[in-house]
Structures are given as C-alpha cells and as structure tokens.
Amino acid sequence: MNTTPGTVGSDPVILATAGYDHTVRFWQAHSGICTRTVQHQDSQVNALEITPDRSMIAAAGYQHIRMYDLNSNNPNPIISYDGVSKNIASVGFHEDGRWMYTGGEDCTARIWDLRSRNLQCQRIFQVNAPINCVCLHPNQAELIVGDQSGAIHIWDLKTDHNEQLIPEPESSITSAHIDPDASYMAAVNSAGNCYVWNLTGGIGDDVTQLIPKTKIPAHTRYALQCRFSPDSTLLATCSADQTCKIWRTSNFSLMTELSIKSSNPGESSRGWMWGCAFSGDSQYIVTASSDNLARLWCVETGEIKREYGGHQKAVVCLAFNDSVLG
C-alpha cells in the first residue's frame, strides 16, 4: 500500500471526527492537533468508517456516501455513492474490503460492491421503519439491522433469510454491536435501556441464535450508541444524558462513568454524548459530543487525556483506528 509521508494514512493512528458543521477533521490523537480538514459539501455527516486497509474513509450523509482518500491530501471525495432517498445513518465494511454496507431512513439496508466499477448498490434489505444502525457479525455473513419501530433484524447474507426480535416495542433501536469474540450482542434504545444477548451458532451454515442475557437500565435518557472493546471485556454506552458508561462484560456491572456534565450549577447542558470508539488495546476511548468536542479518556480512571477542539457544531460521529497493519 502506497502512503504519502505526511498524510493521514501514513500515521499509525487515524482519528477522524465529523458532524453538523459539514466537515471531517483528522487529528493527531496524542497531541490534539488537527492535521487535515475536509469539507463535506451539502450535508451533515451521520457516520464515519475507515476501510480495513486504511486507505479511505467513508462519510455517510444525506442521500450519499462519500469516500475520501487517506493517502493523499486530495480535498475532494474520490468516490461518491448516491441513489439513496434519505439520510444514511450507518456505514461499515466487510473485513476484506470487498463490500460496504449502509442503512438509513429510507427503511433499507444496502450492500455495495467496492470492487465493481458500477456504483449502484447490489443488494437491498427492506424493513418497515427507518433504520438507525447496521452492524456486521464477525463471521462476515450476517448483518444486524436496528430500526425505529424497535425491531432488530438479523439478515443472513448467504441465504437471504432474516429473523426479527423486538426487545422493547415502540422504543427505537439506536445502536447494536457484536463483540469481536462473537460471544455477545448488545443493543441500546431510545428509552435508555441496553439489552445484551449471548450468541451461539453463526459458524458454517448455522445461523446465529440469540439467548437473552441481561437488560441494563443504562441511561435515564435516549441512548445513542453501544460499542464493545476490542478485547471483548468492556461495553460502552453513550447517551443524551451527557455520559458514556463503561460496563464490564464479566457481569455487566458499571466500571466507569465518563461525564461531560458541568460542575457549575448555573451552566446548561453541554449536550449529548453521540458516539465512542475504543483504542486497539481497550485502555482508552474517544467520545464525540454535541458541545463541538471529541475527547480521549482513560477507560480505567475516567480521566480526560486529550480534547479535540475545532468543530463549529455538534460532533456526532467518529472513526478511530490505531491498529498497525502487518
């Protein structure tokens, strides 16, 4: 892979943030310095994801996904995927980078072949409500789709079969994630609850079976994202209550609460904690929030190690990759 010295792709740590100010910003994670800003025209950015080979970043917005080059300083998207009628809320990649998946307010999850010169989507999974989140099972063969009616759909890409479960009717599923070991799936909803399932199957032709494990009353307000740590020992949940909470997967007890609440009684809310991403060693976490900042925290102590300031509006999504490719 050719990386130009001084580009984002040449840095072993890639940290990108985006949101409502129509920019994607790239940061030196250790120093807090913004190294590159890309103008994302026409739309806010709802989701960011770095390709597995670290060559590009996908920014999902209103009616399109734009791919920006990490190995040059080209300010323009090198590929644009269009043809979606509403906001795209979620984006991710197959581990080999062969295809991309998205989900959005047009009630569809889509698969896009990244090797094809044709920029149309190849497969569509239609549901009956706007989609908030899509995540890929580590087996690379099942997509988990969460929608605003409260349903979670498990779309088997090999057979096109799908299963559905509704943990809490009428509470919108805002985020779902499966840990890297494929032991657990978590989902959070608009009521602030986090549901966890044990996973079995999902190998060969066996479809994944979900066995309810626990319900965590994680937040008093809207929950926005859940993410397992790379070592599968932690689960983070982010919320409109201005906190990101970190739970131990050994017993799903609370380990650390990261809060952006002001200690000054007169100060109004600093806004929602929109999203998070763990470092590769699971010892740090980066959060995105609507006070225009991203922050790097120590997971164990809850201490803020770095703040990333420069966005003019809410930061609602981020992408973090500090894995060095062999």
Swiss-Prot record:
Describe the disruption phenotype: Death around 10.5 dpc due to multiple defects in vascular system development. In addition, they exhibit a delayed development of their cephalic region.
What positions are modified (Phosphothreonine)? 51
Which Gene3D superfamilies does the annotation name?
Answer: YVTN repeat-like/Quinoprotein amine dehydrogenase
Keywords assigned by UniProt? Acetylation, Cytoplasm, Isopeptide bond, Lysosome, Membrane, Phosphoprotein, Repeat, Ubl conjugation, WD repeat
Entry GO terms, CC: cytoplasm; lysosomal membrane; serine/threonine protein kinase complex; TORC1 complex; TORC2 complex
Which InterPro entries does the protein's record reference? G-protein_beta_WD-40_rep, MLST8, Quinoprotein_ADH-like_sf, WD40/YVTN_repeat-like_dom_sf, WD40_repeat_CS, WD40_rpt
**Residue ranges of WD repeats:** 1-37, 40-80, 83-122, 126-165, 168-207, 218-257, 268-309
Q: Please give the biological process terms from Gene Ontology that the record holds.
A: cellular response to hypoxia; cellular response to nutrient levels; cellular response to osmotic stress; cytoskeleton organization; DNA damage response; negative regulation of apoptotic process; negative regulation of autophagy; positive regulation of actin filament polymerization
Task: From the record heading this protein, give the residue positions of the covalent cross-link Glycyl lysine isopeptide (Lys-Gly) (interchain with G-Cter in SUMO1).
Answer: 313
Post-translational modification N-acetylmethionine, affected residues: 1
Q: Location of the Glycyl lysine isopeptide (Lys-Gly) (interchain with G-Cter in ubiquitin) covalent cross-link?
A: 305, 313
Query: How is this chain modified after translation?
Result: Phosphorylation at Thr-51 by CDK1 promotes ubiquitination by the SCF(FBXW7) complex, followed by degradation.
> One MF term from GO for this chain?
protein-macromolecule adaptor activity
Position of the Glycyl lysine isopeptide (Lys-Gly) (interchain with G-Cter in SUMO3) cross-link: 86, 215, 245, 261, 305
Q: Which domain of life is it from?
A: Eukaryota
Per UniProt, subcellular location reads as: Lysosome membrane; Cytoplasm
Under Pfam families, the record lists:
WD40
Function in brief: Subunit of both mTORC1 and mTORC2, which regulates cell growth and survival in response to nutrient and hormonal signals. mTORC1 is activated in response to growth factors or amino acids. In response to nutrients, mTORC1 is recruited to the lysosome membrane and promotes protein, lipid and nucleotide synthesis by phosphorylating several substrates, such as ribosomal protein S6 kinase (RPS6KB1 and RPS6KB2) and EIF4EBP1 (4E-BP1).
Q: Which family does it belong to?
A: Belongs to the WD repeat LST8 family.
Instruction: Provide the assembly information.
Output: Part of the mechanistic target of rapamycin complex 1 (mTORC1) which contains MTOR, MLST8 and RPTOR. mTORC1 associates with AKT1S1/PRAS40, which inhibits its activity. mTORC1 binds to and is inhibited by FKBP12-rapamycin. Within mTORC1, interacts directly with MTOR and RPTOR. Component of the mechanistic target of rapamycin complex 2 (mTORC2), consisting in two heterotretramers composed of MTOR, MLST8, RICTOR and MAPKAP1/SIN1. Contrary to mTORC1, mTORC2 does not bind to and is not sensitive to FKBP12-rapamycin. mTORC1 and mTORC2 associate with DEPTOR, which regulates their activity.
Entry protein name: Target of rapamycin complex subunit LST8
- State the species of origin: Mus musculus
Q: Gene symbol?
A: Mlst8
